[in-house]
Each structure stands twice: as structure tokens, then as C-alpha cells.
């Protein structure tokens, strides 16, 4: 699998025919950092191809994004959100393990699993989501760039500069046709309190979450459960 395709758009079917692909670098518009990857580009009816993370991750020195520590501009969620604000028909993120911080297996697993969204009005859902969203492997991106007479690494280096401008990927086009199934799911939050003793005016918070992945491929010990504490909470402390 070289590409994963999904949609949170409020429609019954995603039908796109011959949508042109446009490389928009890191897909970031950050006025406060004097950065705009969308200079003079109209993405209506087009697919935005974007890099994961931000321009500082592989830079020789900290720049507009304060070094290697990822900003929200580097998150995949931001890439999808900004492309939707720009009116793109779709967005494809180029996967690379180091800047993404996870391998293709993770992308593939989440990309072939159901998506969840909060309940929205039709208008809000249309504004917040592009009709199509997904990821593609770097090798596929390299081939698409090569067919357009471009070197992927060279274009990536250009995207690390504030003067980067979007690049049409020549004759590269995307056509898709798939149905969407929607279900309303009701979940419940559980909140409880156990009063303390000697330090009753203080609190220790114990929390959990609905894991985004649930069941996956067996790990080294054969466990197929994608435990949230390992998935998301390894940076947390307990006391």
C-alpha cells in the first residue's frame, strides 16, 4: 500500500476525476512567523501535496519554527485543516519516518480504520474538512516528482525556505471514487472523586482515553491491544 485515502466530508460518496496535484511545501501559513507556503495558489479542484513536520526539523540551525521541536504547524491535523481553509479538493501528506516520528505501518493502520469526528453542522463539516485526505509513501512522491521533471529532495530543500512558492506537479492527476458509511456513536465521560486524607486540598488526576487504534498487529509479545498508555502517555509523569 503506497497511499491511504479517507474522508470526513459530509457526503455519501467521494468522486474526484483528474484533480491536478500541487506541491505546497510544508503547507503552512504562519503570519506571525513571516511564513506562507500558499503564495498565489488557487487550490480549488486540486490536491495539495504537503510535507510532514515543519521547515526547521531538518534545517542546519533553528529558524522560523524554533528548531527541531515540532510546532502545531508541523502536525498532520494542521495540514488537513489549512488545506480545507484553502478550498483544496484534497490533501496528501508525504510520509517520512523521522519527521513524522512513526513508521508507515502506523499510518496504514490508522488510514484503514474508521475515522471519528465531533458532531458538526453540515456547513461546519464542509468548511473543516477537504473531500479527500490521506498520506502517501515517500517513494511514491519521488516517482510523481520525477515524472514532473523534479527532484523530490531538491524541492524539499526549497520548501525549507520562506521564499518557497507552490509547484504544480505537471500532468500528475488523481481520480478516486468510493462510498462513505456514516454512523452516529454516543460515548460517555466518567468522572469520579475520592477525597484525600492528610492532603485533602491537593489532587492527583488519573485519566484514560478512547484509544485511536484499538486492536492492531501482534507486538513482540503477541499482544494485539494498542494500549493508550504506551501510545500517548509515555511523556506523562505519575506521582
Where are these regions (language model features)?
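Terminal peptide-recognition signature
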Residues: 22, 43, 83, 137, ...
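Catalytic-core environment of secreted peptidases
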Residues: 2, 42, 46-73, 90, ...
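Short, solvent-exposed loop/turn and secondary-structure capping segments
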Residues: 33-36, 59-64, 95, 100-107, ...
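Noncatalytic luminal/extracellular "stalk/propeptide" segments of secretory-pathway proteins
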Residues: 1-62, 168-189
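Mature extracellular/periplasmic domains of secretome proteins
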Residues: 11-12, 37-43, 78-89, 106-121, ...
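Long, well-ordered, tryptophan-enriched scaffold segments
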Residues: 85, 89-98, 102, 108-188
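Second-shell loop/turn segments in exported
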Residues: 7-12, 23, 32-38, 62-80, ...
Amino acid at each position: 500500500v503506497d497511499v491511504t485515502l479517507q474522508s470526513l466530508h459530509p457526503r455519501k460518496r467521494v468522486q474526484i476525476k483528474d484533480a491536478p496535484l500541487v506541491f505546497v511545501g510544508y503547507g503552512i501559513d504562519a503570519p506571525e512567523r513571516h511564513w506562507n507556503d500558499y503564495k498565489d495558489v488557487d487550490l480549488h479542484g486540486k490536491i495539495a501535496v504537503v510535507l510532514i513536520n515543519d521547515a526547521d526539523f531538518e534545517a542546519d540551525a533553528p529558524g522560523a519554527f524554533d528548531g527541531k521541536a515540532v510546532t502545531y504547524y508541523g502536525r498532520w491535523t494542521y495540514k488537513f485543516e489549512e488545506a480545507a481553509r484553502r478550498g483544496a479538493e484534497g490533501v496528501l501528506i508525504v510520509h517520512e519516518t523521522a519527521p513524522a516520528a512513526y513508521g508507515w505501518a502506523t499510518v496504514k493502520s490508522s488510514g484503514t480504520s474508521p475515522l471519528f469526528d465531533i458532531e458538526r453542522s453540515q456547513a461546519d463539516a464542509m468548511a473543516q474538512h477537504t473531500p479527500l485526505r490521506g498520506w502517501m509513501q515517500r517513494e511514491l512522491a519521488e516517482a510523481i516528482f520525477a515524472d514532473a521533471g523534479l527532484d523530490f529532495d531538491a524541492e524539499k530543500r526549497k520548501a525549507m525556505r520562506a521564499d518557497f512558492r507552490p509547484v504544480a506537479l505537471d500532468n500528475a492527476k488523481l481520480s478516486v471514487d468510493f462510498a462513505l458509511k456514516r454512523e452516529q456513536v454516543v460515548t460517555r465521560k466518567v468522572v469520579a472523586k475520592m477525597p484525600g486524607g492528610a492532603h485533602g486540598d491537593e489532587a492527583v488526576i488519573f485519566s484514560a482515553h478512547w484509544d485511536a487504534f484499538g486492536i492492531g498487529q501482534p507486538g513482540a509479545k503477541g499482544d494485539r491491544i494498542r494500549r493508550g498508555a504506551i501510545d500517548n502517555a509515555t511523556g506523562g509523569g505519575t506521582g
